[in-house]
Design a protein with these regions (language model features):
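Core of compact, soluble alpha-helical bundle domains
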Residues: 1-91, 95, 99-148
Length: 148
């Protein structure tokens, strides 16, 4: 894959565990309640899942195809729903990955990085509308539709 920015992709690939840890820390900084909502075990699972996010981000940047991240986000959305992780938390995780990755790549690669992460965020926001993930239900409506 040499159609895109191979230098930026190589820098991301070399980031390794430190990049993933910084991405999770950045996500927790962006949303202070992130750590309260998720147990340590869930945060460790998200940290290991970030490896797949970074791999797909590397592919998207190396091939100059930001839609690769959108395809990946569409595939993993169901998995996170089953694990009861909200799509808003995945958007926050992507924003943390954006911050951590921007510190590693060269300034010329940031545009491709932003485009790929924006594609994933768009997909997660689309999936957010399903099953009331976007917001908490109103208590009165929850009482009325309790059987539904």
């Amino acid at each position: 894959m040499t159609a895109g920015d191979t230098t930026g992709a190589a820098l991301l690939r070399s980031g390794g565990a430190r990049l993933r840890a910084r991405a999770l820390e950045s996500a927790m900084d962006l949303d202070p309640t992130f750590g309260d909502r998720h147990s340590e075990l869930t945060r460790q699972a998200l940290l290991s899942d970030l490896e797949a996010f970074v791999d797909r981000l590397v592919t998207a940047i190396a091939s100059n195809d930001p839609h690769a991240m959108a395809t990946f986000a569409d595939l993993v959305a169901v998995r996170y729903r089953k694990r009861r992780i909200s799509m808003d938390d995945l958007v926050t995780l992507c924003e943390g990955l954006r911050r951590a990755s921007a510190a590693i790549v060269e300034p010329g690669s940031v545009a491709a990085l932003d485009a790929a992460i924006d594609e994933a965020i768009t997909v997660f926001k689309w999936h957010r509308r399903l099953a009331g993930d976007a917001r908490k239900r109103h208590p009165l409506l929850a009482f009325i539709y309790k059987g539904a």
